[in-house]
């Protein structure tokens, strides 16, 4: 019985140590959520306006630009999967991977070969273990992304996308870049502290919606200087980098929210486990004391009987 009691007390100490870790992780995640959420809210207007501006310019100029034109017989689609560098975030990464697998299946059904790019050590580990060919990866900043990180990623993807304009073969071009016909990004959209959703978006070619002409609404007239094509060439890298940066900010906020929720659940479970183990230990100790008392009483009775004889 004593060994069992020692075992229970050891398990209580272990659960207490785990609770300290999960509680600390919960507090860290909580402190980061507010800042991450503020960055998301600050980036959304710029992301929305640059997309709207390019849409209006495309409508006004009727430009035949690679950013706008759906290519004939697209063969390769670049997919950027945004994950985390660390674990302990519940189903955060699993949901992203599940959504990316759905996108891969859809692209293959359309006759397109997915070309994989990843952000975060978890995605690199996940796809490397499954023998996926990861074209390029970036890591070390999933919780605190900066625009410079998005620029670096965007430049890589834009080069591959523009290389796909004149790429008619299945091999890489002279510069060693495998051309892409589409660009997609899979990330976790931050909706609230309690709601995050893994989604996939196409960022190139842009989806331009031409609205029906309404004579009652004023229309913006554009005079392009330099040319509209030159303007789009200049804005394309910035547009892609902006969309990537906005997605990484959403993912960072979602990661912190998911980690906070997971660590709170783990802390609550540790509390429940400690209560259960403490109750078991008290019962075991009570049983041990009862047995010791019984042995003492039995011994005393035996001595009394011996004395009477």
From Swiss-Prot:
Tell me how this protein sits in the membrane. Peripheral membrane protein
Taxonomic lineage from the root: Bacteria, Bacillati, Actinomycetota, Actinomycetes, Mycobacteriales
Lyase recorded as keyword: no
Q: What species does this protein belong to?
A: Mycobacterium sp. (strain KMS)
What is this protein's record name?
ATP synthase gamma chain
Q: Name one GO molecular function term.
A: proton-transporting ATP synthase activity, rotational mechanism
Checking PANTHER family in the record gives: ATP SYNTHASE GAMMA CHAIN, ATP SYNTHASE SUBUNIT GAMMA, MITOCHONDRIAL
NCBIfam families per UniProt: ATPsyn_F1gamma (TIGR01146), PRK05621.1-2 (NF004145)
Localisation: Cell membrane
Q: Which PROSITE patterns match?
A: ATPASE_GAMMA
């Amino acid at each position: 019985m004593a060994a069992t009691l020692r075992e229970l007390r050891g398990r209580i100490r272990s659960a207490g140590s785990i609770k300290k870790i999960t509680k600390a992780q919960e507090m860290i995640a909580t402190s980061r959520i507010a800042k991450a959420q503020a960055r998301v809210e600050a980036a959304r207007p710029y992301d929305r306006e640059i997309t709207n501006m390019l849409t209006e310019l495309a409508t006004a100029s009727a430009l035949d630009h690679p950013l706008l034109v759906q290519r004939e017989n697209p063969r390769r689609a670049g997919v950027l999967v945004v994950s985390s560098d660390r674990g302990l975030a519940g189903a955060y990464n699993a949901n992203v991977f599940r959504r990316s697998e759905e996108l891969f299946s859809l692209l293959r059904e359309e006759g397109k070969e997915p070309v994989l790019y990843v952000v975060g050590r978890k995605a690199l580990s996940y796809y490397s273990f499954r023998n996926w060919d990861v074209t390029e990866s970036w890591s070390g900043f999933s919780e605190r992304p900066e625009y410079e990180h998005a620029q670096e990623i965007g430049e890589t993807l834009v080069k591959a996308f523009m290389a796909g304009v004149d790429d008619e073969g299945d091999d890489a071009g002279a510069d060693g870049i495998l051309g892409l016909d589409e660009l997609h990004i899979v990330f976790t959209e931050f909706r609230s502290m309690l709601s995050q959703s893994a989604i996939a978006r196409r960022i190139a070619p842009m989806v331009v919606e031409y609205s029906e002409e309404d004579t009652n609404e004023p229309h913006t007239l554009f005079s392009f200087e330099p040319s509209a094509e030159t303007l789009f060439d200049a804005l394309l890298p910035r547009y892609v980098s902006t969309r990537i940066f906005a997605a990484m900010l959403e993912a960072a906020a979602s990661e912190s929210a998911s980690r906070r929720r997971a660590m709170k659940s783990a802390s609550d479970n540790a509390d429940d486990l400690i209560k259960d183990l403490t109750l078991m230990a008290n019962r075991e100790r009570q049983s041990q004391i009862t047995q010791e008392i019984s042995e003492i009483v039995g011994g005393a009775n035996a001595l009394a009987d011996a004395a009477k004889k």
